Amino acid sequence: MDQGPINRPHFFFTTAPMPCPYLEGHLERKMVTDLTGPEAERLHESLSRAGFRRSHTIAYAPVCPGCTACVPVRIRARAFVKNKSFRRIVRANAGVTAEYVPARATVEQFHLFSQYQQARHGESDMALMGFFDYRSMVEDSPISTSIAEFREAGGELVAACLIDHLSDGLSAVYSFFNTTLPQSRGLGTWMILWMVDETVRRDLDHVYLGYWIAESSKMAYKERFQPLEVFGRRGWIAFDERGRPG
């Protein structure tokens, strides 16, 4: 993929303060920009490497006053080695098959998405999403995006992940799974492990996981996937070096 310079001026905006969905009592603000036009793919590549994330047709990054809790993280896929716990999860899902499908919303996906939201995020706005909202989340992408569907041997859809394709790896946009299955299946963890393996199969380097938040149980789990890199003033550095002055 051509990684040349962006050829036209690009405008960034900040959102109004809103209650933070991860840290109680905090307010969040985001810097956002539209991913439109012929340079959308190239702009998304550059911004992803600068810690931005994509939602629909915008790229965003947190710029919350007085707070730096959201830390962009990515897994070094080639150096990743599954520990005992991860290997157990892989064995528990040995019968699950994965298939890339185009980023097109289906009723089957939406039913699974809704069940997941009600079980895990029942108080959030996402739990109120209808099919057309879900379709917008999946299909409104100006870049190379697909869905990985994961099915049991009998064909039942048990998990799915919306994935952006980058020249250096894969970016997990949003994943969901059947929460009624035994917790020992660890389907959320298993999807990340699958993405690591898929990244290596594609001869790429990184799995972008979005933001790690140490104080949030919903986001702190990402530190389990070592070796991990974090993005900050010094660019991408090893997770273990994040507290060192640079």
Curated annotation (Swiss-Prot):
GO terms for molecular function: arginyl-tRNA--protein transferase activity; leucyl-tRNA--protein transferase activity. One of its GO terms (cellular component) is cytoplasm. The lineage of its organism: Bacteria, Pseudomonadati, Pseudomonadota, Alphaproteobacteria, Rhodospirillales. Its EC number is 2.3.2.29. Functions in the N-end rule pathway of protein degradation where it conjugates Leu from its aminoacyl-tRNA to the N-termini of proteins containing an N-terminal aspartate or glutamate. The keyword Cell cycle does not apply. It comes from Rhodospirillum rubrum (strain ATCC 11170 / ATH 1.1.1 / DSM 467 / LMG 4362 / NCIMB 8255 / S1). It is found in: Cytoplasm. It catalyses: N-terminal L-glutamyl-[protein] + L-leucyl-tRNA(Leu) = N-terminal L-leucyl-L-glutamyl-[protein] + tRNA(Leu) + H(+); N-terminal L-aspartyl-[protein] + L-leucyl-tRNA(Leu) = N-terminal L-leucyl-L-aspartyl-[protein] + tRNA(Leu) + H(+). InterPro entries: Acyl_CoA_acyltransferase, Asp_Glu_LeuTrfase, N-end_Aminoacyl_Trfase, N-end_Aminoacyl_Trfase_C, N-end_Aminoacyl_Trfase_N. Keywords: Acyltransferase, Cytoplasm, Transferase. One of its GO terms (biological process) is ubiquitin-dependent protein catabolic process via the N-end rule pathway. This is Aspartate/glutamate leucyltransferase. Belongs to the R-transferase family. Bpt subfamily. It comes from the Bacteria. It is an enzyme of class 2 (transferase).
